[in-house]
């Protein structure tokens, strides 16, 4: 802690101006500690130098009770958070303070949340598929180990449930470490996630970091960096880490609030002019090195379902795979409501996933595309007016569409159906058999919410009795 002490001269909501001596202005991103009247320490981060002796800071917590003239101490370093084994099984805020009822974390090892991205020499990305056990993802938009994946969808189509299922599958099937970062989302969901993880036993392999929607914009803007910093430590120790960010849109949204509070002129649709720079600084740190990997899954809220909005559009540039959740699919009762035609992946390539996988995925997409084209004709004339070949395509497409649904472990209490983890070999075999026409006589409804193709046949036998 340095001896550089200033005084608060202005407070406008979460923006705090602090006056220091001319030659002792704190650096940009330094943490400033202000002792409140009730004894609590308010942490602010330096964002701008205003004039010769004033710094403009953003508070990481509420500023109620703060007044002018209070002393502010420059810590001489950015906000630092605990890293290492001590963070597993715990919940933290943006400052690395525990939010659960556990003991204080007195860890010697701390990392600053502002760190440079790994250099080109350190980076390593060998294209390799990451099995999730979710059929529609593994078959049509497979995830890359050490890649960045975007989960796109409007409000209420199932982004958070899909993330929870991924955490569950990764912990149980791969034994990997996960860092979950809740950025500007509902506290209730964080609470539910914590208790579900406690029940399923995956909490011991997970660190949770939250900056929820009731917190000041500074906390929501920086909490993604806190979670990333914890994940970077595990990566540098040679681990394969999963970093979940729910929701990356709130990172952009908080940045736009902070930008407006700092008086910057807004850019397109009211976003901050530095949107691409801020997103790039975060995303470039989420990468795999020669030591270990960070595979990141980022939920992306799409405002008004408009994919051309600057916030989701800026996120697109950084992704290796995108999983698009569709309201029209959710409306017909198929969950996960992943759009098989809009979702894509860079590694759906025969050199990475193999010839058989690539061929089956291509044929599935082709049939679904043809079915989409035929739907207009069906709506006007009915199925009976189609050619026999097209009737067969429609019948198989409907079976494929229903077979892309799957019961989730984390949704068991709502659906009453036991969750299923489906290995990629079983997924490919199931769809290959449907494409070959082996199950043309099986009723369509048997394919809905089944795991493997054997389960479909069991359901069909039960229905026939």
Swiss-Prot record:
- Its principal location? membrane
- Ion transport: present as a keyword of the record? yes
Any idea which positions bind ATP? 153-160
Keywords in UniProt for this one? ATP synthesis, ATP-binding, Cell membrane, CF(1), Hydrogen ion transport, Ion transport, Membrane, Nucleotide-binding, Translocase, Transport
Q: What protein name applies here? A: ATP synthase subunit beta
- Into which family does the record put it? Belongs to the ATPase alpha/beta chains family.
Q: What class of enzyme is it?
A: translocase
Q: Which reaction does it catalyse?
A: ATP + H2O + 4 H(+)(in) = ADP + phosphate + 5 H(+)(out)
Which PANTHER family does the record associate with it?
Answer: ATP SYNTHASE (PTHR15184), ATP SYNTHASE SUBUNIT BETA, MITOCHONDRIAL (PTHR15184:SF71)
Q: Which SUPFAM superfamilies match?
A: C-terminal domain of alpha and beta subunits of F1 ATP synthase, N-terminal domain of alpha and beta subunits of F1 ATP synthase, P-loop containing nucleoside triphosphate hydrolases
What is the top-level taxon of the source organism? Bacteria
Species of origin reads Clostridium perfringens (strain 13 / Type A)
State the protein's purpose: Produces ATP from ADP in the presence of a proton gradient across the membrane. The catalytic sites are hosted primarily by the beta subunits.
Molecular function (Gene Ontology), one example = ATP binding
Q: How does it sit in the membrane?
A: Peripheral membrane protein
